[in-house]
Amino acid sequence: MDDDLALQRAVALRSGLDDYELDDADLDLLEVDGEDADAIAFLPALPVLAIVGRPNVGKSALVNRILGRREAVVEDTPGVTRDRVSYRAEWNGRRFTVVDTGGWEPDARGIDASVAAQAEVAIDLADAVMFVVDAMVGATSTDEHVVRLLRKSDKPVFLAANKVDDARQEPSATELWSLGLGEPHPVSALHGRGVADLLDKILKALPDVSAVAKQEVGGPRRVAILGRPNVGKSSLLNKAAGEERVVVNELAGTTRDPVDEQVELGGRVWRFVDTAGIRRRVHLQQGADFYASLRTSTALEKAEVAVVVLDVSQPISEQDVRIIDLVLESGRALVLAFNKWDLLDDERRRYLEREIEQDLAHVSWAPRVNISARTGRHLEKLVPALERALESWETRIPTGKFNAFLAELTSAHPHPVRGGKQPRILFGTQSTSRPPTFVVFTTGFLDPGYRRYVIRRLREVYGFEGTPIVLNMRVREKRKH
């Protein structure tokens, strides 16, 4: 059926709905038939403020105080902020970027050494630095080491003497003149005391446009990297970004805050959101892991497409399936990345294919890439998979074509008779994209099996690779004359 004929048929079907009881919401829906794509804007790079200091001096609490919301994971355990994390902030009408870093320990071993290295990188990428010291502890040898690094940076440095909760404790802040960084600013991240005055001074030193940050594009496609702890999410982002962006350690769960990074892949910019992994038994978790899990869900809400990373060296688990189901519930596009593929032998590969067929049958439509995040093998296949998934996610089927599709489908395979009645599809329309959401007006309730059949046929005819499809029903009765 050509487009003109399909449109004429749809108009006739639509007019037939006037014989049925329609409410205001129905009428509003029937008027919708346009694109809903967001415009992409280009924004100047915002000035960057890095917040650095030893572990557990209150850096993340200060970030939360500046932002006015709980963003950085805060706990009374040294080293709980392990990655460099960027947040957008605004103060007195000025927008800027805040970078929270893990704590410094000059002689750190293992993961602490990685965090220290990232803090040094953060200083290089900042326009100004807030150096946080615990005024109640005073200057330590570690602080002296940090001061030497700060002096090398030649950046404006503001000394925040934290944990000064009232005027009686201000002499402790005064003692920090000894560090040679100029005036110590007594603040209390816990109570907010002194933070506003310090921010006023910092903003005077920050340029209007960052001298160091990459140019920020307003609309890079947003990708959430999801998966169980230690499946290779951070390694995947590091390989894509070409730098040690996220602390990678064999200890499961070493990523606690989602970390955004703009990465150029396949000739375009993407914004990857690396997450903490979704933990089992959330209600049993310690504080930091609990909040990080909540943040993972938030990261997914901010994303347009999710890459779920699965470790092929282990069987597909219930937790893997739950993470995939979370993506489906959120309505995001989906790509499956099977990591550590280079480690598979033939026997494990055959067994894995059977697992995929059995456990992931409900997402057989998702693009699949077999990669090695560690070596970067087949990473180039990720971009075409993301592009296909996003294109499907934004697809809109014209109303005429959709109704022609429904007519052909119901003619070849009408709904079964139930209780002496056979529900009919009167008319259909696509209400939105992102994900594609269809509404059908019917004379009766459609069986779940029949709805699955409609969705399956939609995929066969139109593709929709990499996106969930939502099919809603509106059962309507004829008007009583």
From Swiss-Prot:
Binding site for GTP 2: 227-234, 274-278, 339-342
CDD domains linked to this entry: EngA1 (cd01894), EngA2 (cd01895)
GO molecular function: ATP hydrolysis activity; GTP binding; ribosome binding
Domain spans labelled EngA-type G: 47-210, 221-394
Domain of life: Bacteria
Record-linked SUPFAM superfamilies: P-loop containing nucleoside triphosphate hydrolases
Keywords (A to Z) from UniProt: GTP-binding, Nucleotide-binding, Repeat, Ribosome biogenesis
UniProt-listed PROSITE patterns: G_ENGA
GO biological process per UniProt: ribosome biogenesis
KH-like domain location: 395-477
Protein family (similarity comment): Belongs to the TRAFAC class TrmE-Era-EngA-EngB-Septin-like GTPase superfamily. EngA (Der) GTPase family.
Oligomer and partners: Associates with the 50S ribosomal subunit.
PANTHER family tied to this protein: GTPASE DER (PTHR43834:SF6)
Role played: GTPase that plays an essential role in the late steps of ribosome biogenesis.
Name by which UniProt lists this protein: GTPase Der
Annotated organism of origin: Leifsonia xyli subsp. xyli (strain CTCB07)
Gene this protein is translated from: der
